[in-house]
Structures are given as structure tokens and as C-alpha cells.
Amino acid sequence: MIFTGTANTRLAVDVVNHLDMSLGKMTVGRYSDGEVMVEINENVRGKDVFVLQPTCAPTNDNLMEIMVMVDALRRASAGRITAAIPYFGYARQDRRPRSARVAISAKVVANMLQVAGVDRVLTMDLHADQIQGFFDIPVDNIYAGPILLGDIWRRNFSNLVVVSPDIGGVVRARALAKQLEADLAIIDKRRPRANVSEVMNIIGEVDGRTCIIMDDMVDTAGTLCKAAQALKDRGAGAVYAYCTHPVLSGGAIERIETSSLDELVVTDTIPLSEQAQACGKIRQLSCAALLGETILRISNAESVSSLFAD
């Protein structure tokens, strides 16, 4: 059984349509002061239940929704509850810098999910793989790579080079470059403060080539747009960005529209705003089939990793 909240109903509908089933019957509402109210409207006793809900903006509202949904299902005696969170909010707060008195919010969210009654977590392209270790329950972190890679292959680009937007993304970019039999370039940047970045140097040859920037998410798009400009300044013929999660906060849309990017390709882990849908440089791919197949395999106790075998 698959239930969903209000964060990304369209994706949930696409997933159940792929599986030729219907969404679970549940009412999600708000009291006058904004508190979340959830009621399960069918029998779930002993059932294998999935709650599909990304914790995108409004992050705290959507996070609280999933907590209350899970609690309602647990109290209704669901047999097993899997939190399917395609976009895992708070994932960027995954460690404590040496001199900062800050929370490790990704761990806080992991604790909350487990206390609420989640038995298993399914997510896509976690910002930091080590977040899986914050849980004492199984976590399936699947990858949008097959979706993005398939789109690149269909477009039959020539003279490709895969670009990592920072040192931390090298592993992801290298894996894509290997599958495409393409070269790899790296953008060396320094980030003076949160959501502000400065492109410093490009490691690799991009002159006259088609550049594919690969990243797990695009937020304010500051890094992405500066990277595209730096690549064009170094002679790149075209710059395309492939990012799993379209957070697109702040002035991201305006930056993308006026940037040197030729196109930004994202998935539907997060629904696009009307402004983003109207942007001619943004194109969205569906991850419903991949999520649906993963949910089916988890429910049937089949291998998930074989979906991503080279």
C-alpha cells in the first residue's frame, strides 16, 4: 500500500499508476492554527505500507506531515512502514565543523523518523552517503543516474566532457564519465558562506567541447551559473546541467534564465513551481518508474542494487 501527503502528489500518482494500483485512502488536513491532522481511511493492519513524501519546501511542514502520517499508520497497526523520501531535506547539515556550535540536523531527522515508527527508509541521491549511518534501520539510497544517463544517450551529444561542480562531486561525475566513455573535468571553487560560491579554476580540457555538469541538487543556482560562465569563458561549446533535485530557492529561476547554461535537466523528486515550469531552460524527467520498481522490489524482498549494476 502506498500513501502520500501533500508535498508531491503528482509523483505519488505516477508511481501508483506505474504499479497499476491506487493510492491508499488517507485524509491530510490542517487545523486553524496550522497543525497537521491525518486520518487513515482504510484498513492497514498487518500491511506493508510505503509513505511517499519528499521533505522539500515548505520543509518543516512536509517533514511534520510525514511524522504524523507514520504515527497514524503505526497506531493503525501497519505491519511495516517504509518512509519513501525522494528528496531528503536537512541532508546538507550532516556534520559539525570543528569550530562551530551547530546541530547535525540530518541526524535529528533520522532520530525523528525512527521514533515516529519508520521501519525502513527509501531515498534518492542523498547529499551525503554517510547519512545512511545516522539510522539504525535499513536505508535504500537509490540513484537517478539511469534516468539522467538515458536522457544524455538519447540526445547523442558529441565531444563530451563530464564536469564535477566541486571536489565533493568527483565520484559521481567520474562514474558518469566512465559510462559515457567521456573525459572528466573538475571545477575548483571556494564557498565563503552558505549559498554563496566563487568559481576559482577549471581542471581539465573543455575548449570546444560539450560540457555536462552533474550534481545531486540545484538550490540557489549560484554555483551552477558561475560554473557555466567559467566553462564558456574557457571555450566550452555548450553547457548542460543534470541535477536530481530541483530545490530552486531564492532567485534561482532568474539566474538560470540569464545564465550561460544551455539547459538544466532535473527529475520530479520535487515539484516545479509555475515559474520554473515556464522557464525555457529547465526540463524535468520522471523518476516514477524507478521509484515504483524499487518499491516493488523492497515489498517482494528482491534485490534493489541490481537495478544499478553496470
Swiss-Prot record:
Localization of this protein: Cytoplasm
GO molecular function: ATP binding; kinase activity; magnesium ion binding; ribose phosphate diphosphokinase activity
Cofactor binding notes: Binds 2 Mg(2+) ions per subunit.
Residues binding D-ribose 5-phosphate, per UniProt: 191, 215, 219-223
Residue numbers annotated as active site: 189
Residue positions binding Mg(2+) 1: 127
Keywords: ATP-binding, Cytoplasm, Kinase, Magnesium, Metal-binding, Nucleotide biosynthesis, Nucleotide-binding, Transferase
GO BP terms: 5-phosphoribose 1-diphosphate biosynthetic process; purine nucleotide biosynthetic process; ribonucleoside monophosphate biosynthetic process
PROSITE patterns: PRPP_SYNTHASE (PS00114)
Source domain of life: Bacteria
Keyword ATP-binding: yes
Catalytic reaction(s) noted: D-ribose 5-phosphate + ATP = 5-phospho-alpha-D-ribose 1-diphosphate + AMP + H(+)
Cellular component GO terms, alphabetical: cytoplasm; ribose phosphate diphosphokinase complex
CDD domains, per database record: PRTases_typeI
Pathway info: Metabolic intermediate biosynthesis; 5-phospho-alpha-D-ribose 1-diphosphate biosynthesis; 5-phospho-alpha-D-ribose 1-diphosphate from D-ribose 5-phosphate (route I): step 1/1
Positions with a binding annotation for Mg(2+) 2: 166
Stored SUPFAM superfamilies: PRTase-like
Job description of the protein: Involved in the biosynthesis of the central metabolite phospho-alpha-D-ribosyl-1-pyrophosphate (PRPP) via the transfer of pyrophosphoryl group from ATP to 1-hydroxyl of ribose-5-phosphate (Rib-5-P).
Subunit note: Homohexamer.
NCBIfam families: PRK01259.1, ribP_PPkin
Family label: Belongs to the ribose-phosphate pyrophosphokinase family. Class I subfamily.
Protein name per UniProt: Ribose-phosphate pyrophosphokinase
